Structures are given as structure tokens and as C-alpha cells.
Amino acid sequence: MSAQLVSSRVISPKKIIVRRPVSWCRNLVLGLALLVTCIGQADARKISRVIIDAGHGGKDKGANRGTVYEKDLALKVAFLVEKMLKAKGMPVTMTRRSDQFISLRGRADIANRYSNAIFISIHFNAHTGTRLNGVETYYFGDEGQKLAAHVHLRMLSRLNPRNGNTRQRQDLGVLKATRCPAILVECGYISNSAEREKCLTSAYQENCAKAIVDGIWAYKTYR
């Protein structure tokens, strides 16, 4: 998925932008944000099902560099997320399980079949330049923002990216058409050669999946 550059500005604790701070400052920001999102534990949210959407597929390759296709990487991470969630007893629906094309409306329609569901769309990023790197989490709506905050904080913690941000995207049809809380996670830039090599490793893919699952569980547990 192509990216647009985002300004590095101060935002609320539930919307975090990281632009390569020194390590102690980075840890302080992350710790404070975790504290804010976890203060006031309430009854767990009722989540009946997690919809895992592996971005692109079939004729839609997504971002690509050489023989590295976003659609393939997204599906690998999606399968890992599914496996981890099922191990926790959480029902999961995949929007696709193979290299097939599904429209954005079709993906949202799958999610909209269920009540008390959440929707996680998994992607990898690219840009015309080769220097951009990091993880990004997009959301739409208030509950989407809360879900994005939990997932993104775990992405920062597990992956330790150089850059990362969360922001609302009103131009992403798959999020707007989904009635349940929905986010889109960009797991790394395959247009950056160093980051692309990391994205291709099973260890990085597993850490992406663990971060997403940890974030889902935190969202489920904390208001």
C-alpha cells in the first residue's frame, strides 16, 4: 500500500507518532502511552469474532519489489494471527485463505455479517522513495482509534521500528464500509531494502502477528 508522508507533531496519548527519539525518550513515550490506555480496567469488551483481512490478493498484488509481493506477505502474517487467536479460544474469520481477489466491499461485507466483531486488515507498505520505513496503523471512528492504539503500541514494542504512527483515514473504503471497529496495519516498507529483508523473515512476521494479537487482547480487556 503506498504511503503519504506524515508530519511529526505532538498528538494525544492514544494517537502516537514516533520519529527516531533517543532510547530513553522512546521508552518513556511508550510507557506513558501504555499507562494511559490501560488506566481504569473495566469489564472486558465482548468480542465474538475477529475478522482477519489479508490485504490485496489475486490480480491485485499490492505493493511489490521484484518478486516480493505485499499480498503474499500479508497472507503469511494473517495465518499466524489466526493461529494465535484460535489458540486463545477466539473465533476467527479470514476474508481470504488463498491468492484470490476480493473487492473492498466484499471484505467489509464479510465483517458486517457478525455482531460484536472487530476487523484487522494486514498490509505492507511501499513508497516511491527507498528511505521511508516503519509501521503505521490506520483507523476510522472512535472505537477504531482505541483498537489502533493498543495494536500500534505493541507493534512499537515488539518491532522497535525507526518510525511509526497512527492516524484516522477517512479515505480507506474498507474501513469506512465496515460497521465494527476496524483498523489497517502496515507492517513495514518493502520499498526500503533493509526493511524488506526483515519483512521476509519468519521471525519478523511472527513478531508482527504477536503484536497484533497482544493488541487485540489489550483492547478486549481495557476500556
Regions found by a protein language model. Give the residues of each.
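Bacterial N-terminal signal peptides that target proteins for export
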Residues: S7-V29
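Bacterial N-terminal signal peptides
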Residues: N27-T37
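Sec/Tat signal peptide C-region and signal peptidase I cleavage site
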Residues: G40-A44
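Active-site-proximal helix/loop segments of hydrolytic enzymes
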Residues: R45-R49, V68, D72-R223
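Short glycine-rich His-centered loop
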Residues: S48-T67
